[in-house]
Amino acid sequence: MYKRQVEQIEDVAKYDTVKEVDVVANFGHIRAGKYEEVTADIKACADAAHKYGRELKVIFETDALTEEQVRKACHCAMDAGADFVKTSTGFLTGFDAHGATPEIIKVMQEEVGDKCKVKGSGCIRTREHFLQLIDMGIDRMGVGYRSVPVVLDLDR
């Protein structure tokens, strides 16, 4: 179980200024097919966040997973009571970085439907990509500060 993560969530979630908490799912367990453990870990984190009225975002590091693993991880998060599923932290090493591709966002949206929100994060660096994700109905995006002027077309 994510005992330390639960303790950290409890430490920060009690502050009124905290509205959401991010947690990284154990992608090693996801890759190994240990979905019951993944669900239990996320549920413990969701329970801790919800105890204080905070939303929980679960990050999968989709660049380290197959499409099928992402689909199953989405179900783990939904079953555990997560509020968001999120593509990546932006700090994963050892894998090619693709981040919030339209393809992986579509997969996540297909799996969670209206039961969970989707946040795309990582590699959103062009206005076209940004607008495409908006057109797809993504709930939220994380855009690196260097990319903000580009995606918002502020460099005119």
Predicted regions mapped to residue ranges:
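Conserved small/polar residues in nucleotide/adenosyl-binding loops
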Residues: 1-2
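Glycine-rich phosphate-binding active-site loops on the catalytic face of alpha/beta enzymes
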Residues: 5, 14-30, 79-97, 123-125, ...
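Short, charged beta->alpha transition segments
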Residues: 5-16, 42-47
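Generic hydrophobic/aromatic pocket-lining and core-packing "Φ" positions
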Residues: 9, 42, 70, 74, ...
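Active-site glycine- and acidic-residue-rich loops that bind
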Residues: 31-34, 61-70, 145
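Alpha-helix-loop-beta-strand connector modules within alpha/beta enzyme cores
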Residues: 35-57, 62-64, 75, 79-80, ...
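Short amphipathic alpha-helical patches
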Residues: 36, 69-72, 100, 131-132, ...
